[in-house]
A protein has these predicted regions:
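Membrane-interface "cap" regions at the ends of multi-pass membrane proteins
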Residues: 1-50, 174, 224-225, 250-256, ...
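Transmembrane-helix boundary/entry motifs in multi-pass membrane transporters
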Residues: 21-29, 60, 86-117, 134-140, ...
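Extracellular loop-to-transmembrane helix junctions
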Residues: 27, 54-79, 93-98, 102-106, ...
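Flexible loop linkers connecting adjacent transmembrane helices
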Residues: 52-56, 79-104, 129-135, 160-164, ...
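Extracellular/periplasmic helix-exit of transmembrane alpha-helices
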Residues: 75-87, 245-246, 267-294
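Hydrophobic transmembrane alpha-helices that form the core helical bundles
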Residues: 87, 105-137, 144-148, 319-338, ...
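Transmembrane alpha-helical segments of multi-pass small-molecule transport proteins
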Residues: 109, 134-158, 174-179, 346-363, ...
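Hydrophobic alpha-helical segments and their helix-loop junctions in multi-pass secondary transporters
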Residues: 174-213, 222-226, 231-242, 395-404, ...
């Protein structure tokens, strides 16, 4: 059963990628990572950084174990999607279209593109906040206009977009790790407290209650816990891993390489989140921040001057990482869903990517001008995740268990158990978001 799949894997792989191992003189471990680092960069954005910092500030080291568990679930879905792309010989949307019809694939593509589009404005605001932290006198709106313009020019000028993107993300990941590791070393956290944080326990004052509307506002006792799960365990980013391994040109002979790449990406994601959580637990206990700009300012008097500079540089890297990748996920998955070529170098993914970027920039500039958040857009994006996240999780598990796609490499019992646990978490999160939407609109 695996032989036709292997043959199909060769189809559509650019000639430049075939026989790459024979010509490439770079270390094998360096070639074995790439797609998952791109995924890690889009998942660990400003929202993840802020959530990790606030959990550390509010609960100390006590929820490090939950971060590890969330990383395991994310790793399960990332490796599964990567295996689908490598063994199946096509992207997840293409495989869905071949078996369930183009309309089903289109629903997935349109939904994911709209989710990326509605939240792209927050990536713009994060870049603006990070730039203002480094250069306070600059007008954030002009920063956004120039930044988006440069990236759009680059999108259409670059010939090998994926290769450049992968190399850039490797550099950015290295920069993030360097900056935040220096910070946590200078902060001198309690090693015993960190070890205890990996032992499952529940913080005092945090209940398992549901969101409630009190005095016109919504109170959610598990908002930080839910945010940690939502920002670290991203089904949409995991789904895109199947596309990225196709961009890389990996085939069945690269099966173990795809798994190793996914593990490396998850380790980076959870590792950086843990470092931020530990640093905040030591430096700003009991002082959670509302946005990354406030977080940087709150750390200024507490970190040494050199450490604060490193933090701001790392912060800017975090803000920039998901800026382009989020838009590219939306653009390429939409093109893939409606039956257009999905590679980043193709025309339609680039056009849709620009559309997502422009929509996010316009909304962010309006928000900066008025000082008000686009509440209706946020509600719309949250409503899309209620449908989209469970749909993508089910799709990944369904594809990974089909013998006509995976052959002898179908999901094992352990992977299905972890995948089922992840699906349960995704469904519960969707129900929770739905409850908050009902309370908001009532």
């Amino acid at each position: 059963m695996a032989e036709p799949t292997a043959a199909s894997c060769v189809e559509g792989v650019p000639p430049s990628n075939r026989g790459q191992d024979a010509r490439d003189t770079t270390p094998s471990w360096w070639r074995s990572v790439g797609p998952a680092l791109i995924t890690a960069c889009v998942v660990f954005g400003p929202g993840s950084l802020l959530v990790s910092a606030n959990i550390g500030a509010s609960h100390g080291y006590q929820l490090l174990w939950l971060l590890v568990l969330t990383g395991i679930l994310m790793g399960t879905y990332m490796t599964t999607a990567a295996r689908i792309g490598v063994v199946g010989g096509a992207t997840p949307c293409t495989l869905v279209a071949q078996r369930l019809g183009r309309p089903v694939a289109a629903v997935i593509g349109i939904n994911l593109c709209l989710i990326c589009g509605t939240f792209q404005f927050s990536n713009n605001l994060a870049v603006a906040a990070a730039a203002e932290t480094l250069v306070p006198k600059l007008d954030a709106r002009w920063i956004l206009l120039g930044f988006n313009g440069l990236i759009i020019i680059f999108l259409f000028a670059a010939k090998q977009l994926y290769r450049f993107l992968e190399r850039t993300m490797k550099i950015m990941v290295g920069l993030m790790l360097l900056c935040f590791v220096i910070n946590v070393i200078l902060a001198r956290p309690s090693l015993l407290g960190i070890v205890r944080g990996f032992v499952p326990s529940w913080p005092e004052g945090v209940s398992l209650g549901v969101p409630r509307k009190i005095d016109g506002g919504i109170q959610d006792p598990m908002i930080l816990i839910a945010s940690l799960l939502g920002t670290t365990f991203s089904v949409a980013a995991a789904f895109y891993q199947g596309n990225l391994v196709r961009e890389k040109g990996w085939m069945i002979k690269d099966y173990s390489r795809g798994i190793g790449d996914s593990v490396a990406g998850v380790c980076v994601l959870t590792g950086v989140s843990a470092i931020i959580m530990i640093t905040a637990a030591k430096v700003i206990p009991g002082e959670p921040a509302d946005n990354i700009g406030v977080l940087a300012e709150s750390l200024r008097p507490l970190l040494r001057s050199v450490a604060h500079v490193f933090f701001c540089v790392g912060l800017f890297a975090v803000a920039m990482n998901p800026f382009l990748i989020n838009a590219m996920i939306g653009g390429s998955i939409l093109a893939d869903g409606i039956g257009q070529p999905p590679k980043l170098s193709d025309r339609w993914p680039r056009r849709f990517t620009v559309l997502v970027m422009l929509a996010g920039m316009v909304v962010a500039m309006l928000a900066l001008r008025t000082g008000q958040k686009p509440v209706k857009l946020i509600i719309f994006g949250q409503a899309l995740t209620v449908l989209g996240n469970p749909l993508m999780a089910v799709t990944i598990l369904w594809l990974a268990n089909r013998k006509d796609i995976m052959g002898d490499r179908r999901n094992t019992v352990i992977l299905n158990i972890l995948g089922g646990l992840g699906l349960l978490v995704v469904v519960l999160m969707a129900v929770r978001v739905l409850m908050r939407l009902v309370l908001t609109l009532s």
